[in-house]
């Protein structure tokens, strides 16, 4: 690569880092003053962070902090209130986690249980219990998290027995922008029975990978709505639901985010729309 190209790439990287730092500073400043808004909040994370032992303490501290401003509730209760379009006069928070990483079992679930709540865990059956080659490819090419491990099938079954909701997240964390019927049937419909076989429980919930409407075709969304009782996005969070109330919207977060950032996003009100 020429010196000019290297210089240009470095300049773009520096600008990106500057924008990121400025955004973080704004969120921190606003979040320090924010309080969790009244309403039902569903947070959507993925894993416990890069340093799992430390981040279990970070997650515990976050839950303690949020519990001072809101009622932490089981995910079924939160979803039911949204489905019934019930306005609430207090802040309520529930949790979901996608992909099926092993730290959901070893760190996340026990910490949630300390606070008397569960979560919905949306798993990729192709990843759970996969061989080393599949895991390495998934970590590198799909989620960009080298070194992560998936839960085993026994771990998923155990969590289901402990009251965690096990949902579907496609077989292979597929981008569902396709309209190919065979691909969509495999990733959406076949995923339901695959999750049920692993968990030993009925799978009625689905969250599509990447979570935004630009990552799912209208054909794929209709198939998901026909296959599952509840479908979740990670888009359009100010609205409780989308697509005529058939899709419930979650707010992305991660365990290792600063508390002020999480509080900032939870300080935004929600509505059922017109």
Language model segments and positions:
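C-terminal active-site subregion of NodB/CE4 polysaccharide deacetylases
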Residues: 1-96, 102-103, 178-274
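A short, Lys/Arg-enriched amphipathic alpha-helix followed by its capping loop at the start of a domain
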Residues: 61-69, 111-115, 162
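A short alpha/beta connector and helix-capping loop motif
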Residues: 107-125
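Generic enzyme active-site microenvironment
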Residues: 96-97, 167
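Aromatic- and acidic-residue-enriched segments that line the glycan-binding/catalytic groove
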Residues: 129-147
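Glycine-enriched alpha-helix->loop->beta-strand junction motifs that scaffold or abut catalytic
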Residues: 113-118, 162-166, 225-230
């Amino acid at each position: 690569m020429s010196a000019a190209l290297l210089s240009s790439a470095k300049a773009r990287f520096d600008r990106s880092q500057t924008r990121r730092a400025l955004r973080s500073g704004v969120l921190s400043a606003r979040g320090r003053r924010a309080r969790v808004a009244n309403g039902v909040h569903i947070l959507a994370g993925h894993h416990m962070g890069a340093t799992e032992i430390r981040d279990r303490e970070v997650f515990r501290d976050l839950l303690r902090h949020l519990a001072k401003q809101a009622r932490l509730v089981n995910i079924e209760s939160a979803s039911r209130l949204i489905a019934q379009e019930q306005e609430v006069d207090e802040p309520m928070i529930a949790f979901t986690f996608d992909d099926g990483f092993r730290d959901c079992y070893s760190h996340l679930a026990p910490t949630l249980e300390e606070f008397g709540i569960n979560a919905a865990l949306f798993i990729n059956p192709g990843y759970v219990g996969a061989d080393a080659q599949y895991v390495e490819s998934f970590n590198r090419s799909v989620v960009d998290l080298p070194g992560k491990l998936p839960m085993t099938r026994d771990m998923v079954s155990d969590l289901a027995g402990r009251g965690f909701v096990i949902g579907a997240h496609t077989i292979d964390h597929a981008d569902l922008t396709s309209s190919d019927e065979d691909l969509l049937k495999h990733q959406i419909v076949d995923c339901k029975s695959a999750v049920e076989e692993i968990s030993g429980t009925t799978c009625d919930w689905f969250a599509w990978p990447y979570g935004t409407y630009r990552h799912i075709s209208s054909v794929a969304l209709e198939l998901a709505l026909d296959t599952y009782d509840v479908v979740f996005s990670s888009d359009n969070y100010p609205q409780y639901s989308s697509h005529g109330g058939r899709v419930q919207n979650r707010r992305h977060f991660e365990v290792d985010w600063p508390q002020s950032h999480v509080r900032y996003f939870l300080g935004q009100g929600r509505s059922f729309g017109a």
